[in-house]
Amino acid sequence: MAWIAIDNDGQEVLFASCPRFNEEEGAWIAEDGKVVEVRGVFEMLNLEYNGKPIEI
């Protein structure tokens, strides 16, 4: 699975692993420590977002 998220800079980011939820901050935290807003989860074999293929 792949995860689409929006980072603090407003950029869409694709993650291979799930961001973790930090209950103290009430936020999703990405692998690199940035707070993100999760937008979707996708099967790795069919990567599309808003009907457009996602390039990795």
Segment roles from a protein language model:
Residues 11-23, 40:
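Short, surface-exposed terminal/edge motifs of secreted or surface/virion proteins that either
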Residues 25-56:
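Low-complexity intrinsically disordered segments
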Residues 2-7:
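A short beta-strand micro-motif
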